[in-house]
Each structure stands twice: as structure tokens, then as C-alpha cells.
Amino acid sequence: MSNYFIYHLHSDYSSCTTNIDSVTKIDMYINKAKECGMTALAFSEHGNILNWYEKKSKIEKAGMKYVHAMEAYVTETLNEAIRDNYHFVLIAKNYDGFLELNRLNTKSYNRHDNSFYYRPRISLDDIMNTSDNIIITTACLAGLLNSQKDELKEKFINWAITHKDRVFLEIQHHNVSEQISYNKNLYILSQKTGLRLITGTDTHSIDKPHAEARVIMQKAKGVYFDNEDGWDLTFKTYDELVESYRKQNSLPMDIVFEAIRTTKIVEDMIEPFELDMSTKYPKLYDNSLEVFRKMVYDSIDTHPYALKFHTKEEIVKRIEEELPVYEKTHMIDFMLFQKFVRDWEHENNIYVGAGRGSVSGSYIAYLLGITEMDSIRFDLNFFRFANEYRVSNCDIDSDYYDPDRVKTRNFLLTCDKIKSAEIAAFGTIKLRGAIRDVGRALELPLDEVTEICDKLEEVEINGKKVEVAGETLRKKYPELFKYVDLVQDVIVSVGTHPAGVLCASRPIDEEIGLFSLSTTEHMVSCNDMYGLDACWWTKLDCLG
């Protein structure tokens, strides 16, 4: 069966950068691509790579190749604040390209050098300075080549000609006059320069109902995108894509088929990559084990209460039970870092809760001042915290008074001994919000919408009480709930985890990617807490 590679694709994660850009979840695209027999998939969200690990793991679980990509906003220059955001699709060819693309994403969110100006942006020079590990397409009608900047276009084209092995001119199938004209211009340019045509789809919805729901939500939020009338931004099978080009009739079909085949050429250029799934605890010392052992044994004599309740022999015996487990579970760097934080807290008169969670089972943690719970005295189980036969990412929650919690988080986010970031958290539309938004778009009276919300029923699902709309409401308001069901639980915003801080010694900007928000002065990790934990990154929770 003939097929192609979809690389220009937007999910609801694009809505974190562009308001209500899609109401389609990534799982829907992945399932559809698998159903169509596609062998690779990329998400090119507008100006972000948010939760790329979730996409990678799900795409690979579906038996397809994950392709790391982004639709970047590109400006002529960062020397002045001009709002000229041209679109380019950037695709990582391999692991080095993955790191490079993450760095470019991080750079685009710098709010101090004009990179972030209404949108996260890189400069055209950044595009032209990419390595051979990055594949580039000219994207959509919002791309540079559809602008009136002749001098700038010539600059890019001259550069692209010298990199034609990895730069492609993107045509699209949308049956609108401007796209038809643009496709023809790109074909002429391709003939003149030897740059290859490739077909992008600029997919924003899995199907027509989701496309309608996208418009409904845009209306509800007062969002309007120019020049989308007549566009078909829904997912296309190979046959549907071919038929769309036949109807568009912008180019000879042999040229279209070649542009479709080029998507598979690009897919073949991309090397799958594995992630380092080892522990990534912050490392403060080169000789961690030696430092740890000395700290632990020295603390027998320096701890204010250890020898008051236990003999030295009893303490040493317990230490010798725990130390090998810490070594085998690779937790020593984490414990040293946690002690470093506790020492700072004590020096700054910050009170921490006496002990929370399984760490209180460790006598070594007690000796080092990480917990105030004496696990020998209270007969607590160490192996609930650390177990060589059940190794998990180490996590210690700490309780603070609110002012101290803020101070500790700020310390972690500014400490020059480590690299750190806030952690992404995503806001979704819940049932009541979906009813209100869709009701507003459908111009239902506010009182009636409020009455509908008041009539929601509470049921228990998997042990949790949740609100649902009963059959009576659904029968009375079929159009309302048609769209409510499509937009409920869709991502509409991004913020930060209220307690967690990502702490590392490795370069977060390239191994994960960072972005910025107007609500915090600190950079934020592109993966949420689940993606970070799955890849063994360290998160400290400062709880109130």
C-alpha cells in the first residue's frame, strides 16, 4: 500500500503557544497513523516541543519511528523587536539533531534578547547556522518564501541551495487560491534551484468533527486565525491526500507524487535514537562514595542524639546494612544533594517537617539531618525507601511553612552548584468549563448554561467522584454535548508544577529543552513531572 510520512502536525500541545490551535489529543493521531500503516510520525507544534517524551514513548509503543520536530517562529533579526514571525519546520535527523533542536527551542524563549516577542523565536541566522543534523522545510503560507521580503528571501534561498540535501520546499494540498499560487511559485523555484518539493499537511484536527470543535472553541475564546476559510486541516490518508491534490489542481500530478515520495525520503534520513535512562541525580562531588561514607561515619559522633539512644556498634551495624543498598541503587549523589539542601535550610533558619514518607526508614538519612525520624528507635523499614531489587527514582517530599517553601524553591532555582528549572504542568478543559465554552460559542443564554451545569450528576469512577452529564441533558442538548465531548480534557494552557523543582548536573536545555512563561522568572522544563520521572531526572518537592 502506498503511504507517506506526516511531519507537519499539530496537537492540543500547540495551544500552549497559539491559543486554541488544536483540540486533538496526540493519542488520536498516533492511533490513526498506525491504522493507516504509517511507519513514522512527527509532531511539529507551534514554537514548542512540549511533552516530547510522552509523544516519543507512545509513538514507539505503537511500532512507529518517533521523529523530533517543531514548527519554529523565525525573525529577520533579534537586534530589534519586530513582529515578523516566519514559519519553518525543523526536524531532528538524529540524536545530535535532537539536542540541537532542543537548544534552539530553549533559545527561542529567551525574554531578554528579543527572542521571545509575542512568540518564541529564533533568527534567520540561527536557521542558517544549523548543522547537517537538522532538516528544514519552508512550512506554510506563513513561511518566509511567501512574504514580500525579497532581499531576505534571496539570502535564505542562496543558503538553501548549498544545503539542498536537507532543505525542502513545502507544498500543501489546501484548495485555496493563495496556496495554489504559492505551490506554483515553489515549483518554479524548485526547477530553478534544484531544491526538492515536499508535501506538508499542516494537520490541526483528526477529523471534521474535531475541526468543527476547534472553531467552536476559538469562537468561545474570541480567537480568530486569518485566511483559514476553505482550508482542510484534517488528517489525511495517502489516498485522501492524493485526491485533495487532484481537486486543488495546482501542479502536475507527477510532481505531486514526487513531493509525496520525498516525505518517505526524509523519513529514511532520520535515525531512531535511544535516551539515556540511567539515574540523573545532581552530582556535587567527583568522589561521591568516599565523601558519603566519611559524612555518615563522622555524623555518629556529631549528631546531637545518635549516641544518646543507641550504642556505636548498633549504629554501625545499621549503617553497614544501608550503605551497600545506597551504592547498588545509585542513590548516593541524591542523598548528598539532599544533605546539601538541608544544610542550607538549617543555616537560613528554615524549618522543615520532621519526616515525610519512606525516607524516615533510613538511619543514614537521620544521621545526615535529612529526616528527624530515628528509624532504629521507632523500628521503621529502610527497604521501603531503598531496595536493590526494586530500584525506583529517588524522591523525598519536604514540608515547609509557606514563606520558607518559597525561599527554598528560589534557592534551588538559583543555586550555582546545579542546573535547575521549574516543571511544566498542563491545564485542561474540565466538564463544566467545556459546557460554558461551547455554550457561549453556540450562543446559549448564560442562565441556561448555568442551569445545565447545576444538573450535572456525580458518579464514582475508579474510586473517584466525578461529574457527568446524564442522558436527560444529552437528549435535550445534543449539539452542545457533541462538542463538549470532543473538547473535554483537551490541553488549553501551560503553567508550572506548584511544588516540584527539576535539579540536575546535566544540560537541561539540550537534553530536555526549556521554555519560559510570563508568570515566572525561571525557565521551565519541556517535559512534565511524569516524563521527567520516566527518564530518571530528579525532582525535589517543596510542599506547604
Describe these PLM feature segments.
Residues 1-544:
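Alpha-helical scaffold/interaction cores of sigma-54-like transcription cofactors
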